[in-house]
Regions:
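N-terminal pre-ligand scaffold of iron-sulfur
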Residues: 46-132, 139-142, 183-200
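N-terminal twin-arginine translocation
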Residues: 19-24, 33-54
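Residue-level detector of bioactive/disordered segments in secreted/extracellular proteins
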Residues: 4, 38-39, 140, 154
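Cys/His-clustered metal-coordination modules, chiefly Zn-binding fingers
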Residues: 126-194
Length: 200
């Protein structure tokens, strides 16, 4: 025969205790979500500020160069694809920072097409801009020869290098930040830091 006393007893659940338990779980979930958001925003902020920046006097090396060979104006071809470069610290003999926000692009245009202001920032038609698109932060890597514009493939924003990196075709709404160039001992040197914060 079935013995009622042998069966496990169920304690009735107090609705107030259950509500308190749910609140604790939700508070813990909320706290952990907040902690994750704060941690990821700290990481984004750290990435947004390159450790050593882009400084006047820096040499320029390609992003593929492990030897630290400084670039000359003649290394950038007229009407060719932009060359992606990093600022190179002559004291440490290393790129200042390989943060993507430190990446610059060099492009060469016909000096006759440049305004006086742009010509003053260039060396033999070579201009330097941030390589980070101001729309969503993708790399600007292409040259659209038919339009003579720099092109970001992510959302097809185009920038006019002859017009100080102004937006030629959106969705980007802000010009590419730029740097002035000079020539020293036959190689390209940054004559200024970056004109505005790179990226979005």
């Amino acid at each position: 025969m079935f013995n009622k006393d042998a069966s496990p007893r169920m304690n009735p659940v107090n609705p107030d205790d259950a509500l308190l338990q749910r609140r604790k779980i939700l508070q813990l979930a909320g706290a952990s979500t907040l902690l994750c958001c704060v941690a990821s925003s700290d990481l984004s902020a750290a990435d947004a500020l390159p450790k050593a920046g882009i400084n006047a006097g820096d040499l320029l090396v390609t992003t593929r160069d492990d030897t630290g060979t400084p670039l000359k104006a003649s290394d950038i071809k007229l009407g060719g694809k932009p060359l992606l470069v990093y600022p190179f610290d002559i004291d440490t003999k290393k790129p200042r920072s390989e943060s993507r926000l430190n990446k610059l692009l060099l492009v060469r245009v016909d000096p006759k097409d440049l305004s006086e202001e742009a010509r003053a920032r260039s060396v033999d038609g070579v201009l330097a801009f941030s390589a980070v698109c101001t729309h969503q932060g993708c790399d600007v890597t292409e040259w659209k020869a038919s339009e003579k514009t720099l092109l970001c493939f992510c959302h097809s924003s185009q920038y006019n290098p002859v017009n100080n990196g102004a937006v030629a075709v959106g969705p980007a709404s802000r010009a590419l930040p730029s740097c002035s160039l000079a020539e020293k001992d036959g190689v390209l040197v940054l004559a200024s830091g970056i004109s505005a914060k790179p990226g979005v």
